[in-house]
Design a protein with these regions (language model features):
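Generic hydrophobic transmembrane alpha-helix motif, especially the helices
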Residues: 1-59, 64-68, 102
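A short glycine-centered flexible hinge/capping loop motif at secondary-structure junctions
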Residues: 2, 6-10, 81-83, 129, ...
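A residue-level signal for alpha-helical anchor/packing sites in multi-pass solute transporters
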Residues: 3-4, 34, 47, 51, ...
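Amphipathic cytosolic juxtamembrane alpha-helices at the membrane-cytosol interface
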Residues: 9-17, 67-71, 76-103
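Glycine-rich helix-loop "coupling/hinge" segments at transmembrane-helix boundaries
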Residues: 24, 35-39, 50, 65-66, ...
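Transmembrane alpha-helices
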Residues: 26, 86-118, 165
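Short cytosolic juxtamembrane segments of multi-pass membrane proteins
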Residues: 167-182
């Protein structure tokens, strides 16, 4: 969606930007919590919810990157050669977005892990046969005062994983997109 909005501009950009802004206005945790409690919690439901709720940041980044790239000389030369719009998008613009998409994907991965853990902690995420750190923390609540390691170990593991993914994302951003360096 961001690819189309950034390339075509005009009414297409306005419509897609409106959809993105509408989606960004909804609180992710509340929508996921309401949807998961209505549909029921399972691994398949959580994966579909994460996909439906976390696409917007990809679209925003792609739209902004395409708006910068669409006026480049190599895109204009492809248009002058008579290449179709689909070919220009697929062979000229999309390969130049891979770096930005990798960075957003690593940072959104941490967001998805935290959202899944929150849903599982609240009881509407994945169900007990499937391991989840949120579920482990929820099941350890009764033992919090007598055996604090039951919730501390999955909590610390979750924190280390999310921190590690964020650090990798920051490192990739500095490596792939040098424009944003301080």
């Amino acid at each position: 969606m961001g690819l189309l909005a950034g390339y075509f501009g005009g009414k297409t950009d306005a419509l897609i930007s409106y959809l993105i802004t509408t989606r960004l206005a909804m609180p992710v945790v509340m929508v996921a919590l309401a949807s998961a409690s209505l549909i029921g919690g399972s691994l398949k439901v959580v994966i579909i919810l994460l996909g439906c709720l976390l696409w917007d940041r990809f679209a925003v980044v792609v739209r902004a990157a395409v708006q910068q790239i669409r006026d480049a000389e190599y895109v204009a030369s492809a248009q002058a050669l008579g290449c179709s719009t689909l070919r220009i998008l697929a062979s000229e613009i999309l390969p130049n977005l891979v770096g930005a998409l990798i960075v957003v994907a690593t940072l959104e991965m941490a967001h998805a892990i935290l959202l899944e853990s929150a849903l599982s902690f609240l009881g509407v995420g994945v169900q007990p046969p499937i391991p989840s750190w949120g579920l482990m923390i929820a099941e350890g609540k009764p033992y919090m005062f007598f055996s604090p390691w039951v919730i501390a170990i999955p909590g610390v593991a979750l924190m280390v994983l999310v921190l590690g993914i964020n650090l990798v994302g920051d490192g990739l951003r500095d490596l792939i997109l040098p424009d944003g360096r301080n």
